[in-house]
């Protein structure tokens, strides 16, 4: 999800390693490059496919476990199957798009990387737009193919489950997104990539597995958002009051979790704050 580090692995030394320079906040030259628009297309298509497969899985599970249609409710894929669908699709799509767009597929991931200066503001905003549009189109395809079941079973929209407070829902989204974005930073750390040649290849695996684990933990609470595009796409296409109740949770929670993960990785684990402070003190001041 970040630029690949190329170098001679045999001569690598922790003392010799230097972090790649941070991306500028604004870089208008990106708008004139085909690679930028190719990355936007990749994010759009990846998010579309992600929502299509996962929401179709959710709708299929609910139809299989509907007592009116299937008295034997053990025929569904269950929560485990839904979690595998979400985690598996992230693994596949990150693997396919990492070399083109970085494989974000999630506005919260993009936001975390923006705070860490891994992407420019222009790219981050355009990625989020592409992701949200892709999510809307993906859910629209599900509704087109499963129109009767889609409305009947809630359109795969996120919502706060009965018995849980708003605070619990927000906390679940913050912690779940923290786990995901923290995993993204760790799996794509350029220093680890320079030291261990297998790390870039295996990065999609822990990222997908993090999504899988978080879904197991939070599906009973919020249906698991941790991806504002996923929540927005389902809410817009389903478009019932229930889908919009507490919808803000699925934006505030993921963005807060991503911000905390970015701060923790950059300024605690990587000691970025200490380096920045040392650099500031070493500069002459007038």
UniProtKB/Swiss-Prot annotation:
GO terms for biological process: water transport. CDD domains: MIP. GO terms for cellular component: plasma membrane. The modification Phosphoserine is found at residues 279, 282. Residues 1-23 are annotated as: Disordered. The modification N6,N6-dimethyllysine is found at residue 3. Residues 1-18 have a biased composition (Basic and acidic residues). Residues 1-38, 97-124, 187-200, 270-286 are cytoplasmic. Expressed in green siliques. PROSITE patterns: MIP. It holds the Pfam family MIP. Keywords: Acetylation, Cell membrane, Membrane, Methylation, Phosphoprotein, Repeat, Transmembrane, Transmembrane helix, Transport. A motif (NPA 2) lies at residues 227-229. The modification N-acetylmethionine is found at residue 1. NCBIfam families: MIP. Aquaporins facilitate the transport of water and small neutral solutes across cell membranes. Aquaporins contain two tandem repeats each containing three membrane-spanning domains and a pore-forming loop with the signature motif Asn-Pro-Ala (NPA). Belongs to the MIP/aquaporin (TC 1.A.8) family. PIP (TC 1.A.8.11) subfamily. This is Probable aquaporin PIP2-5.
């Amino acid at each position: 999800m970040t630029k690949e580090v190329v170098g001679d692995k045999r001569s690598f030394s922790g003392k010799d390693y230097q972090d790649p320079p941070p991306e500028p906040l604004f870089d208008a030259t990106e708008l004139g490059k085909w690679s930028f628009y190719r990355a936007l297309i990749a994010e759009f298509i990846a998010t579309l496919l992600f929502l299509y497969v996962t929401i179709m899985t959710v709708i299929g599970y609910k139809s299989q476990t509907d007592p009116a249609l299937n008295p034997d409710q053990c025929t569904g894929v269950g929560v485990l199957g839904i979690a595998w669908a979400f985690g598996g699709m992230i693994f596949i799509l990150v693997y396919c798009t990492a070399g083109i767009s970085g494989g974000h597929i999630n506005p919260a991931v993009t936001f975390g990387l923006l705070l860490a200066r891994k992407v420019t503001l222009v790219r981050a905003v355009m990625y989020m737009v592409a992701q949200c549009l892709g999510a809307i189109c993906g859910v629209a395809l599900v509704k087109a193919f499963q129109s009767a079941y889609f409305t009947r079973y809630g359109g795969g929209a996120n919502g706060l489950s009965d018995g849980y407070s708003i605070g619990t829902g927000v906390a679940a989204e913050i912690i779940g997104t923290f786990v995901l974005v923290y995993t993204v930073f760790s799996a794509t750390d350029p220093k680890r990539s320079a030291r261990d040649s297998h790390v870039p290849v295996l990065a999609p695996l822990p990222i997908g597995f993090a999504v899988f684990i978080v879904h197991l933990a939070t599906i009973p609470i919020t249906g698991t958002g941790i991806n504002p595009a996923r929540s927005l796409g389902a809410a817009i296409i389903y478009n019932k009051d229930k889908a919009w109740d507490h919808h803000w949770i699925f934006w505030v929670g993921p963005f807060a979790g991503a911000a905390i993960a970015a701060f923790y990785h950059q300024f605690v684990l990587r000691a970025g704050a200490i380096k920045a402070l040392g650099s500031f003190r070493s500069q002459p001041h007038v």
